[in-house]
């Protein structure tokens, strides 16, 4: 009606949520007044139809299912359901529920979600599976299409490799620093 679509992205909203929570921690450290409780996400907001793009459910995309866990939103039953829907044993996390490919950025972000939701053993298992795809240079491909047994897409994206590093740090505490996703 006003020229704007009434759509919101769960992934973007969760990223903003994490940023606001981090800002609040910084503000407290600096002695500044800050309260974003009214605009922060919760399970009720996540279940809103505003996240169904143009009336089409986004539940088939793994990111739209696990990003709320990065914010600490959800419960063990919901994360188990997400794991059941998107986890491919021995390979990692599918990007899209009906497609035969896993991506290692999605796998890594889901690993972080599992650690955040106190499912560290599941996180460790999936990370070990992802590690099998590291090439002889120490680099991870973006994804793997398991029906065709090919790397797909045929690229080695920086964000994928960054996500694997962050996931490994969440699981093993390699940096020995506090992780913003786990705070």
Q: Where would I find each of the regions flagged by the language model?
A:
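Residue at a conserved register position within TPR or TPR-like alpha-solenoid repeats
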Residues: 20, 27, 69-72, 111-114, ...
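Extended glycan-interaction surfaces of carbohydrate-active proteins
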Residues: 1-8, 38-104, 125-183
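Internal helical hairpin/lid segments
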Residues: 97-118
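Alpha-helical positions within canonical tetratricopeptide repeat
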Residues: 34-35, 121-125
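The feature captures the catalytic groove of carbohydrate-active enzymes
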Residues: 1-39, 115, 153, 179
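Alpha-solenoid helical repeat scaffolds
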Residues: 26-29, 120, 133, 174
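Generic hydrophobic alpha-helical segments
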Residues: 23-24, 75, 117, 171
């Amino acid at each position: 009606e006003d020229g704007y679509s009434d759509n919101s992205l769960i992934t973007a909203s969760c990223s903003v949520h994490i940023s606001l929570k981090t800002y609040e921690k910084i503000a407290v450290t600096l002695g500044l007044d800050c309260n974003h409780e009214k605009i922060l996400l919760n399970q009720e907001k996540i279940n809103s139809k505003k996240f169904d793009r143009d009336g089409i459910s986004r539940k088939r995309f793994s990111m739209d299912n696990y990003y709320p866990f990065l914010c600490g939103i959800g419960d063990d039953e919901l994360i188990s359901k997400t794991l059941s829907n998107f986890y491919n044993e021995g390979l990692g996390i599918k990007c899209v529920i009906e497609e035969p490919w896993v991506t290692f950025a999605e796998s890594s972000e889901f690993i972080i979600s599992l650690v955040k939701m106190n499912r560290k053993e599941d996180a460790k298992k999936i990370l070990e599976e992802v590690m099998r795809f590291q090439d002889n240079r120490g680099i991870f491909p973006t994804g793997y299409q398991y029906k065709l047994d090919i790397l797909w897409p045929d690229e080695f994206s920086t964000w994928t490799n960054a996500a694997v590093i962050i996931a490994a740090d969440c699981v093993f505490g390699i940096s020995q620093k506090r992780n913003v996703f786990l705070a």
